[in-house]
Amino acid sequence: MSIVFQIALAALVFFSFVMVIGVPFAYAAPQYWDQSKPLLWVGSGIWTILVIVVAVLNFFVI
């Protein structure tokens, strides 16, 4: 279970870095807003799911 937690945590950290770069770029480029908006919603949903998964796994690991 510990290795699953570590993989989920690494995925959350990596995806957070991607979102830190991607979200400001999406807001700064108004000509691509129509293309970026669905990606922001999907990215936010994935990030939220990863946070919940890490929280649940943390409960089982500790």
Swiss-Prot record:
Keywords tagged on the record: Membrane, Photosynthesis, Photosystem II, Reaction center, Thylakoid, Transmembrane, Transmembrane helix
Primary localization: membrane
InterPro entries: PSII_PsbZ (IPR002644), PSII_PsbZ_sf (IPR036512)
Membrane topology (UniProt): Multi-pass membrane protein
Protein name (Swiss-Prot/TrEMBL): Photosystem II reaction center protein Z
BP term (GO), one: photosystem II stabilization
Role played: May control the interaction of photosystem II (PSII) cores with the light-harvesting antenna, regulates electron flow through the 2 photosystem reaction centers. PSII is a light-driven water plastoquinone oxidoreductase, using light energy to abstract electrons from H(2)O, generating a proton gradient subsequently used for ATP formation.
Subunit text: PSII is composed of 1 copy each of membrane proteins PsbA, PsbB, PsbC, PsbD, PsbE, PsbF, PsbH, PsbI, PsbJ, PsbK, PsbL, PsbM, PsbT, PsbX, PsbY, PsbZ, Psb30/Ycf12, peripheral proteins PsbO, CyanoQ (PsbQ), PsbU, PsbV and a large number of cofactors. It forms dimeric complexes.
Protein family: Belongs to the PsbZ family.
Subcellular location: Cellular thylakoid membrane
Membrane-spanning intervals of the chain: 8-28, 41-61
One GO CC term on file: photosystem II reaction center
